[in-house]
Swiss-Prot record:
Source organism superkingdom: Archaea
Keywords per UniProt: Coiled coil
Coiled coil region boundaries: 5-31
Name by which UniProt lists this protein: Uncharacterized protein MJ1333
Length: 84
């Protein structure tokens, strides 16, 4: 069993790795979602991703992307209704 000081360092590193892993997973998710956004809006979201500094920033960006995708879907739906 490592000494308490060593265990504390190990725990801190483990926590850091978990946060970084979550951040990487979220960034990969956002990069996938960016491909679903219409090209005229995509660059603005990419800039927001590159400016994100924390996991919370990326979560907020995902919320914004979900809203954008919802608006795009609603717009497409309305256009199909008009075409009928």
């Amino acid at each position: 069993m490592p000494s308490p000081k060593i265990q504390e360092i190990i725990n801190e590193l483990d926590n850091l790795m978990n946060r970084e892993r979550k951040y990487i997973e979220l960034v990969a998710t956002v990069e996938y979602l960016l491909n679903l956004i219409e090209p005229s809006k995509r660059e603005k979201f990419k800039e927001a991703l590159y400016d994100a500094e924390t996991v919370e920033d990326v979560y907020e960006l995902i919320k914004a992307i979900k809203l954008q995708l919802g608006m795009q879907g609603a717009r497409r739906y309305l256009l199909t209704l008009e075409g009928q």
